């Protein structure tokens, strides 16, 4: 199967108080198109930093990152932003909804950035899929945590991304709401045929993916393929 994400010899080093802090150390892996991958590990293991590098939110100190055929290493910030807008969707632990926009307007943002047509109708269709059509004109402060994450899901899938990155998507939700969000995430992902990369502490969420990469101290310590039906 063709790889949509290739990580080769990637390291990330920060300068702190005159010393070097190695957050990622010579990371190597590829992600097959259409697959689902979980990246797990304790806090400070480097998994969120790795996710940011994979998405082009930051530059690696060394190594090569290729996303959907585009090598990110030498691109400017504006060029990386254009790649993200074209190929990538995001789901965040803290939802990251714009507080001055309604649920509908939040979902419309990526579509507007791409200059898509029939923006409002498409955004409403996605809100309907996540069960929030009747809350489309509510602002984030008027929505529960679970509802905000459902808006975030609709927004993430709005531009039909080739690759979706989810950083602790259930981290701020209770167990019952988390299960609903997980089911919705995988249902939407299956319908869209999107490649899904999740950073999570939740072993049940990780077990639902095709593959689990475990990290510790900036290193990959295991690369597993859990069974999930």
Predicted segment positions?
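ABC family nucleotide-binding domain
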Residues: 2-215
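Short, Lys/Arg-enriched, disordered terminal segments
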Residues: 1-2, 229
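Conserved beta-strand-loop-alpha-helix hinge in the C-terminal portion
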Residues: 219-229
């Amino acid at each position: 199967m063709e790889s949509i994400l290739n990580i080769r010899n990637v390291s990330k080093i920060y300068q702190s108080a005159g010393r070097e802090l190695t957050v990622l150390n010579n990371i190597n892996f590829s992600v097959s198109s259409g697959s689902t991958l979980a990246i797990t590990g304790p806090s400070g293991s480097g998994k969120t930093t790795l996710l940011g590098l994979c998405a082009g939110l930051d530059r690696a100190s060394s190594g090569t990152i290729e996303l959907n055929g585009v090598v990110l290493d030498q691109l400017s910030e504006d060029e990386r932003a254009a790649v993200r807008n074209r190929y990538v969707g995001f789901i965040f632990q803290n939802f990251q909804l714009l507080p001055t926009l309604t649920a509908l307007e939040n979902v419309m943002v990526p579509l507007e950035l791409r200059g898509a047509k029939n923006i409002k109708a498409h955004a409403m269709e996605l809100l309907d899929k996540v069960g929030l059509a009747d809350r489309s004109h509510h602002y984030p402060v008027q929505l529960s945590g679970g509802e905000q994450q459902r808006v975030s899901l609709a927004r993430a899938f709005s531009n039909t991304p080739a690759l979706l990155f989810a950083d602790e998507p259930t981290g701020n939700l209770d167990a019952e709401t988390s299960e609903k969000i997980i089911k919705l995430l995988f249902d939407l992902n299956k319908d869209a045929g999107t490649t899904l990369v999740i950073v999570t502490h939740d072993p049940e969420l990780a077990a639902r993916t095709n593959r689990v990469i475990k990290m510790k101290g900036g290193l990959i310590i295991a690369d597993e393929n859990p069974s999930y039906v």
